[in-house]
């Protein structure tokens, strides 16, 4: 059977002067970072582009690695997110690598109460690093890292093992 790749990124150029890049990210799936970067690189060839609108409304989140990778496209350095749990293995920090793909251009991130998890990590980290203005409603508030423990009957139990924190130390539940 053929594997179908789900497109999680839509984009268009907006504005009277066609100088705003609009990117709608529906979820943080396996290849979202590659799709997202392709759009950003295409937009950056447009010399008139003055800034970006990144729409995360009703984005339920997805893979932590994708949230980190996509956030990293807009930061030169610094912490993106950390997890803190009772066990040492559940406590980790994730950092940006050098290289802002849009060279400091302004960003507006749109969120609502349907924006959760990875969306909150992305929006919160850009806000903490003063790279974006967040507009919309309060986000969903899913600040927990969960693990599924298999049960003998074939089912599973979801257990919160740690919590996500922004560079400022605030929980991502507060985005």
Model-found features: residue ranges?
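Cleft-lining beta-strand/loop regions that shape enzyme active-site pockets
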Residues: 1-152
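Conserved functional hotspot residues or short segments at active or partner-binding sites
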Residues: 167-175
